[in-house]
C-alpha cells in the first residue's frame, strides 16, 4: 500500500510540474516598430495598420527581401497570419526558420516554409543552401482551406529534426531532416520574393519555445 501511494504521489508531482517546462507563447511583433527585427525597412519593409508589409504592387522587386529576427531560435511553435497579393510576375513569399543571414546580401540561408501558387503553399524549400524543394505539401488538403488573396493562418512546428507546417489547420508537410550536419537553430524571417509586383502582409506573429 505504501509503495502504491508513493508511486501515485511521484506521478502526481511530475504531472503538476510538467506544464512549467513549457514556455508561454509571446508576440514577435509589437505592431508599431521593427524592434527585434532587421532588414531593408527604408525601401521594402514597412508597417501599415499594425501589420508588417513587404514588397510593392507598383514596382518590380529586383531580388528576394527578408525581414529577419535579431535572435536565434531552436525548437518552437511559430504562429502567424499572412496575406499574399500581386499584380505581375512571380508572386511568392515564405517564412524562414533555423536560418542565417547571407553576408553582404539581402538573402537568408536555411529552411523556408513557402507561400504561393501553384503548389508552394506549406512546402519546405532549402533557401540559398541546397536550393531545392525538400518536402512537397499536400495540396489536395490545403486547397480545401486556402483563402488566396485573403488572410490565412500559418503554424510551423520545429522539434528536433522534425518540421511540420499547417495552413488554416490543414497539414502541409511532415519533414524530418536526414543530414545531421545541418544546424537546427537560427533566425526566423519573412520574405517577399524578387521578380514580381507583389505584397506580403503579416500579423499576429507569436512563438512558443519548446525544450
List each model region and its residues.
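Carbohydrate-interacting regions of secretory-pathway proteins
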Residues: 21-211
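Bacterial N-terminal signal peptides
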Residues: 6-17
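Positively charged n-region of N-terminal signal peptides that target proteins for export
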Residues: 1-4
Amino acid at each position: 500500500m505504501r509503495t502504491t501511494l508513493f508511486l501515485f504521489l511521484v506521478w502526481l508531482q511530475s504531472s503538476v510540474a510538467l506544464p512549467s517546462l513549457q514556455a508561454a507563447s509571446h508576440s514577435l511583433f509589437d505592431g508599431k516598430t521593427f524592434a527585434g527585427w532587421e532588414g531593408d525597412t527604408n525601401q521594402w519593409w514597412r508597417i501599415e495598420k499594425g501589420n508588417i508589409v513587404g514588397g510593392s504592387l507598383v514596382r518590380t522587386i529586383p531580388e528576394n527581401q527578408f525581414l529577419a529576427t535579431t535572435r536565434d531560435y531552436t525548437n518552437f511553435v511559430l504562429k502567424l497570419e499572412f496575406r499574399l497579393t500581386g499584380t505581375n510576375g512571380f508572386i511568392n513569399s515564405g517564412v524562414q526558420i533555423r536560418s542565417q543571414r547571407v553576408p553582404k546580401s539581402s538573402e537568408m540561408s536555411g529552411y523556408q516554409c513557402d507561400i504561393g501558387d501553384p503548389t508552394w503553399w506549406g512546402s519546405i524549400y532549402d533557401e540559398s543552401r541546397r536550393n531545392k524543394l525538400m518536402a512537397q505539401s499536400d495540396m489536395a488538403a490545403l486547397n480545401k482551406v486556402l483563402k488566396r488573396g485573403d488572410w490565412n493562418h500559418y503554424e510551423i512546428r520545429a522539434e528536433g529534426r522534425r518540421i511540420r507546417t499547417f495552413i488554416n489547420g490543414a497539414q502541409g508537410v511532415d519533414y524530418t531532416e536526414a543530414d545531421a550536419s545541418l544546424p537546427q537553430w537560427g533566425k526566423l524571417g519573412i520574405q517577399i520574393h524578387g521578380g514580381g509586383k507583389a505584397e506580403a502582409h503579416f500579423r499576429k506573429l507569436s512563438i512558443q519555445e519548446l525544450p
